[in-house]
Each structure stands twice: as structure tokens, then as C-alpha cells.
Amino acid sequence: MCKQLLQFFLIISPAISFAQTKSDSLKASRDTTRQLQTVEVTGRKDNSYKNERSFSATKIEMAVKDVPQAISTVTKELMQDQQAFRMGDIVKNVSGVNQFSGYDDFTLRGFRSTTQLLNGLRTVTGFWSMPLLVNIERVEVIKGPAAALFGNTDPGGTINSVTKKPLDVNRKVFGFSVGSFQTYRGTIDLTGPLNEEKTVLYRLNLGYENSETFKTNMGTENLVISPSLSFAPTNKTRVNLDLVYSMSNGKLYRGQPIFGAEAGTQLNSTPISFTIGKANDFLKEKNVSANISLSHQFSQNFSFNVSYLKYQWNENLMEHRTSNGYAVDSAGRQIPTLMQMMTIRRLSKKYNDNMTAYFVSRFSTGALEHHLLVGYDFNQFSVPVGGSSETSKEGYRLKNGTVGNYVKANKENFILDANGNPVPNVPHFNLLNPDYSIATTSGYITTSTATAPARNMAHGIYLQDNIRWNKFSLLIGLRKEFYKDKFNYSKPAEKQVEQNSFIPRIGLVYNLTPDINVYGIYVQGFMPQTSSTMVNPNVGGPFDPLTSRMYEVGAKGDFLNRKLGATVALYHLEQNNVLVNANDPNNPERLEQRGQERGRGVEVDVNGRILDNLSISANYTFSETVITRSADPKMAGRLKENAPRQQGGLWVKYAFRNGQLKGLGAAAGGSFVTQRRTFSEILELPGYAVANAALYYHFDKIQLAVNINNILDKTHWIGGYDYNRLFPGAPRNIQATIYYTL
């Protein structure tokens, strides 16, 4: 990798140097009124719901309205006002984004997405749980394919979390919350300079949460420790170091089950709090990341940026779950009140190394102003040797010490209980009388499997030029992506697949008025299939990579003296080569490529202040995401799973600044999602609307807040796969918070 990087920069350096020489005669640009960062390494001091500038969509700082692609942002101020510290709560403020399930799993513009970035670099998601995000400055959602800059990403969009950076002023904020479901949360945010020259800055974010949740036997404990340092030896060089340690202790939630459901079965047939498991089940996850960034400004118009992120995820799992079948009696008849059970004991790790380096140059060619970016990035994902899975054998105990499916004709070979029924390997779960006590697992007959090591590597060279002329701005980007996937890495049975692609992006912005821009963009996407699908002979691969393309037009504007920002976007998005199960009764692992899926829609986002003391965040989406081509003719024309036609959200906050009510504030809002298809042909999730509100009181250095979520106590489901895996939203809950600022 280092050799490739060196060769690449030796090739492009003369061209950039030439461009820089030519730029010496260029007059100071429109940005001379403030010293712009070339990479995000310093903190944001704004305190609005509106975010004016972004790095995520272009890797250079640009005004959001100058980027020819929809970008939605949720700032820390909105997160704090809503007490939204998990991604599932945060994305309710973003058009076109909804939860696919109760996991770290979302739908963006109708397409499922698990790609998440941290400070513009790729992370590893544990999937099963959403971490506590007390260290996040803002969350940005880049709508549509972002592959031209980041390589293989999901077509619907990419979520980028930006960590809180050190500030050059001393500030200490302590927070404590208590609320429904025995929830307790404490937060600490410390920042300031470490020397008189303010060349060394620090920030430390701490968060701890303990909650029983509204689900039976599903308590969680979460801890986040996130220190950050910034070092600026000169006004041209800055180094930033971010460390994040995140720990989660809980249980793996498989969703609210309704076994034996038929078409029309009511989703409240079981309580939304109902779960299956044992008291000694656990899911322990640890995430550790280290991100170091360097930015150097050679001159006003020429800079270099490099950033590296090391991310590690560890899982330690023990769970009792159903094997999706009823127990049987001595006659082989099903007992619909007893579920067959199994256990999974798993240890696993995932590593990710992500590096990006690029030059940025400003220069002119005649009347054209260029903002050129040339870069290289490398990403390596690894599943190391040492992972293992121990799974209980499904079925009933035989007298010879093994486990098998019960056969009435061979009844004499099975161990029977006092009622003459076969004894299961793992005790059944009684649906009428649930038992969540501690289970004795030492007697289970299990099978152990070592996790196959895997490694995939992606690297790319990318070029981007933002060309300005008069009221026009043209964004041109091109990336060459190289992808290599190794299964059974470093073993004799190692298998390897390589794929590569050219990925273009072109967008145009027209400055209609000083405060309103209109834009259009065409962009392509690329996402290789996973190693397990490409080299496993049972699934029918290798398969072609996922490819996508998007056309988008829209308008962005700043209003009310730039206090309020709005975006309207219309898009057409296509994805090809989607993998789905072939439903082959002789080979349940076999997959097939569906063909094509298409999404069309319109999105509206509004964020900022209407008055100095009246803030608003609003979003609305109308879309249709359908399967357009499929090997199964009956699938063509169907809506995609968990892709609602309409969704939206609203949050309005009013703060009294004068008079006897000075310091008092109130907020109200909510969100809605219309009905959605699932993976089950007989289940459609109902739409829902949830109302929320909050009261605030601020005096001296203390701020008090009371948040009420789901005021009307509406039973609703945020996502789901089928009747056995439903994900209900929380019932009415209250949270009281106090902040003390020094």
C-alpha cells in the first residue's frame, strides 16, 4: 500500500505544483473573510439546528447550498434538545431515512444501508446494537451513492458521524438524566486549551447509561469514553487525534415474536414487551477507534490532508433463541404453546483500517476558478483467526447420547420425560408461562465451529474539480476503484475474488439569487458482493457487484438573514444485481440476483431559526421504491421492504428571552411513517404517528429539561422482517435532565 501511495503522489505532484504556480496571480477568493479549514479538525461553535458548511460530500469545506447533492444534517443542539443519543432517534430528523429494524440498520431513500462513516472514514458496525453517541457533534447524511469519493457504499446514501472537536475556550458541561424504564444517564463534556498559546487543545466526552428498557429481560448498560487532542504548531499545520472507547452490555434482542401467525393476525397478539431468552444470556460489545488527521496549508491556495482510522469491534454473545418450530409430544403432534429452543455462544472480532490522503489546490484558468482535489484512499476489513461459534444441536435427546429429530416410530430410542414426551436438548420455552430464570447450559450438546478468517481490501484513486464561472459551479469527479476479497484468508483453502470499477460524478449548481441555488447531479455507485457469497459454491456465485446510478435535481436556500436553511430534492435512483434467496427447496443457501430496483421521490428539509428564539427542524418525503426486474415475475412492481411511501418529522422550539418567563422554553413535534412491506408476503407493517414535547428552564449555569416521548402512548412498529421478528417503538416515556456548565 505504501509503495502504491508513494508512486501515486510522485505522479500527481508535478501537475498540482503547476496548478499552484499558476494560482499565484489569483486574487483572494470570496472566502478570504474567514480562514477556512481544509479538513475538519477544529470544533464548531455554532448553536443552531442549521449547519452551514460540510466536508463530507466533497472532502473539502463547502457551503452546503453549493454542493450539488442533497445533504441532511442533525446538529448536537437538536440532539440535546430531543435527548436523542442513538442513531435511530437522530435519523427521524432526516428526510428519506427510517429504521429498517431495531438494530443499527436503516433505510435510505428506500434502500437498506449499513454503511456508516466516522469523520469521513469507514467504520465497522456491530449491527445488533446502536452505540451511545454523546461524543458526536453532528450527523450528516449524504443522499444517494457516494462511491465517487468513498468507494463501495450503499446506493441510498451514507451516514457520516462527526465527532466533537476541541475548542479554544474553556468549557465544562456536566449532565445527568433519569427517566422511564429505570433509565439513568450521565454525560461530561470538557474542552479548552492546554497551554497559553492555545496551540494544544483538548476535549473529553464521557457518557454512561443504564436502562431496563420497555422489553422484558432486556436491560442494557453503555459506556463511552472519547478524548480528543488538537495540536497547531503554526497557523498552517494542525494535527488532530480522536480516540473512542464504546462498551455495551445487554442481550441480543430478536424482536417481538408472533408464532403461527396467518394473514391478518394482529400485531398486538403478543405484548410489545414480550421477549424470549434467559437471565444469563448476554451480548457484550466493545468498539475501539483511533483517528489521526493532519492538515498542512503550504500556501493560501495549496494544502495537503491525510487521515487514518483504526476501528476494532469485539463481540461476546450467549443467547437462547427459538429454532422457529413448535415442540412435539410423544405422538409427534405439535404443541403450539411450547417453542423449540437453541443456544448460540459466539466470540468474534472485526478490524477495519481506513486511510485517505489528498492534495487540494485553488487556481484559475482564464475566467474559470478551480478547486481541485486529487487523492488516494485505502480500506482493509479483516475477520481475524480466533473467532468461534458454539451452537446447540437442534432436536431431542437420544439414549445413545446424541440429538436428533423426534420420530414416533423410533420412540424407544429417545429419552422421555414423566409425561412420556421426548426430552429436548435445550428446554422448551413456554409461551403461556414464560420463564426468564438462569439456565444451566453445561448439559447442552453443542457443535463448535471456528470462524473462517476473511479479508477484503479496497483502494482507489480519485480526482475532483469544482469549477466556478460567474453564477455557475461545475463539480466533476472520477474514481478508479480496486477491490479484492479473500475468504479463508491465509489458509490453504483461501479463495480470492477481484473486482474494479470506474465511478463518475458530475453536478452543476446555478446561483439563482444570492441566497438560492438550483442544482442537478448524475452519480454512479459500486458495491462488491461479500466474500461469503462470491466464493461459497452453495450460494451459486460468484455474482456481479451491485451497481447503481442516480439523477437528482433540487434547490437549496438560506433565508431570514441566513438563519434558516432549506433543501428540496427530486431523485431517480436505480440499483442492479441485488442478491435475494432463490427459495430452492433442495439448497436453501442458493441465491440469485434480483435484477433491478428503482426509487423515485421528493424530499424537503428545513432547519434553523425563524426568529432568534424560535427554532425549527422539519422534513418530509414522498417516494416509491419498487422492484422493477426480477427472476420471480410476481415480484416485479412490488414495493421494497421497509420503504414507506411517505414519512416526515417536525420539531419546533420556542425560548423566552425577556420578561418574567425569561429562561423558559418549550418544544413540540413528532414523526410519522406510512405502512411498509416486509420480507413476509402476509405481513405489512402499519403506519404510525408519534408526538413528542419538551420543557426547558435555563438560569445562570444550570439548564433543566423534561422530555416526553410518544405523548399519546401510540403502539407502533418502527420496522420488522416478518411475524417472528417485529420491532416495536417505545411506549410513552419521560426523561428529566439537568446540565451544569462551568
Sequence positions of predicted segments:
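Acidic, small-polar-rich N-terminal luminal/periplasmic segments of exported/outer-membrane proteins
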Residues: 36-169, 553
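Acidic/polar loop-and-plug regions of large Gram-negative outer-membrane beta-barrel proteins
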Residues: 209, 213, 226-297, 312-350, ...
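Membrane-embedded beta-barrel scaffold of Gram-negative outer-membrane proteins
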Residues: 297-309, 313-319, 545-602, 606-609, ...
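Surface-exposed extracellular loop regions of Gram-negative outer-membrane beta-barrel proteins
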Residues: 189-216, 220-226, 287-362, 456-488, ...
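Gram-negative outer-membrane beta-barrel transporters
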Residues: 471, 572-574, 593-680, 737-741
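Structural signature of Gram-negative outer-membrane beta-barrels, strongest in the C-terminal barrel
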Residues: 232-234, 350, 369-373, 377-381, ...
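Conserved C-terminal beta-signal and adjacent last beta-strands/turns
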Residues: 344, 348, 360, 372, ...
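Outer-membrane beta-barrel translocator/receptor signature
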Residues: 135-137, 148-225, 233-237, 288, ...
